[in-house]
Amino acid sequence: MIKESDWNERYHRPRRRRRRRGCLTRLVTTVLVLGLLVGWLWWQQNGLSSETITVSSAPDGFNGYRIAVVSDLHAKEFGEGNQVLLDYVRDLEPDLVAVVGDILHEPDQMSMIPAVAKGLAAIAPTYYVTGNHEWAAGVVRELEPLLEQCGVTVLSNEYVMLERNGDRIALLGAEDSNGYADQKTVQELADQVRQEQGEVYEILLSHRNNHYEQYAQARVDLTLAGHAHGGLIRLPGTDGLVGPKRELFPQYTAGLYDLSYGQMVVSRGLGNQFPCFRLLNRPDVPLVVLG
């Protein structure tokens, strides 16, 4: 005869085992989900991305000309010496690299400049303009000569002429508006190009996306900009959640835009001044292909 205590033990033991297995399953599932979430969030902050943007208004001689736009690095390092970033840019096979400001934001970050500057210059001719943070950090006078020593061409309210297959493009570079009060304006720079070179296709490197009206008024054909960080959190159907001035739902934060005159390509950027959270907005190196 089975004692009642033995019967209860035999009856309840499988139930306890099932409960333990259920708790273990829930624990493992929770750990896996959290691990995947952490990994995905890390990838959102550090996984490089690129969009190929075709601009069809350039001269025929520049068909297929490739420009990699590097913006808002903010001294962020993708691998030691930014080697991951350099390898990524190299794989894009650019004919030109445009660095459109905010490469750093603190004076003590100057030590990271040589590695990334020399690396980019070794990939393709590299041109640089300042952003607001280089001026705010008070490093422009030291930074620009250092970049030149590393093989990068600094365009300080200046322009250079590019030639390819018998056609010409003027590449203009505007200092950020945080610069000197009496510095040349975009309009004045564009007027200088037309006086000296006649009517040519113009590409402007300028940090601030929100100065798009100035670029259109100056009748620049194509502007390459950054500054907006893609709106940080890119909600579906929006141009991002937060703008550079902490405004909600900013405009012109990523991709190609038709202005009242000309076009503008805006990079979502690579880093941030503060530990900001990116969502659906991975670090960005857009590739502009002239068609």
Kindly give the residue locations of the regions a language model identified.
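Beta-strand-turn-beta hairpins that frame and shape the catalytic cleft
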Residues: 55-68, 152-153, 159-173, 199, ...
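N-terminal Lys/Arg-rich, disordered targeting/topogenic segments
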Residues: 1-22, 123
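Hydrophobic membrane-insertion alpha-helices, especially the h-region
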Residues: 25-42
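Conserved beta-sheet core of the metallophosphoesterase superfamily
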Residues: 209-287
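Membrane-embedded segments
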Residues: 61, 65-158
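Aromatic-capped interface at the extracytoplasmic side
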Residues: 37-55
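Catalytic metal-binding/acid-base residues of hydrolase active sites
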Residues: 74, 104, 133-134, 159-160, ...
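Binuclear metal-dependent hydrolase catalytic cores centered on His/Asp/Glu-rich metal-binding motifs
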Residues: 144-145, 149-152, 164-205, 212-213, ...
